[in-house]
């Protein structure tokens, strides 16, 4: 089979083993990210938004003084806090995904790798 540019059976077996390990690790990572609570705050700290590691909204907290400033101030502060939480959450997810896949050599001869 090697004459057709295909990997040998041992390489395929190893690739499948790695794929199964990645799948198991990805499931564990999904559960870990779901359990995280990542807080983002606006610049003056009067609005906070919490997201999971998978960017699912969890809760919002607005300082009572911010609420007294009116709807527009609340909207602006909440959006700023949401953006901060989203940036932190996506950075966390990206970092954990890189940890998950970083040490794996998935290139196989004859398979475009």
Swiss-Prot record:
Main location: cytoplasm
Gene3D superfamilies, per the entry: Nucleoid-associated protein YbaB-like domain
Subcellular location: Cytoplasm, Nucleoid
One GO molecular-function entry: DNA binding
Keywords, ordered alphabetically: Cytoplasm, DNA-binding
Top-level division of the source organism's lineage: Bacteria
GO CC, alphabetical: bacterial nucleoid; cytosol
Family: Belongs to the YbaB/EbfC family.
Cited function: Binds to DNA and alters its conformation. May be involved in regulation of gene expression, nucleoid organization and DNA protection.
Assembly: Homodimer.
PANTHER family, alphabetized: NUCLEOID-ASSOCIATED PROTEIN YBAB
Name of protein: Nucleoid-associated protein Syncc9902_0023
Organism annotation: Synechococcus sp. (strain CC9902)
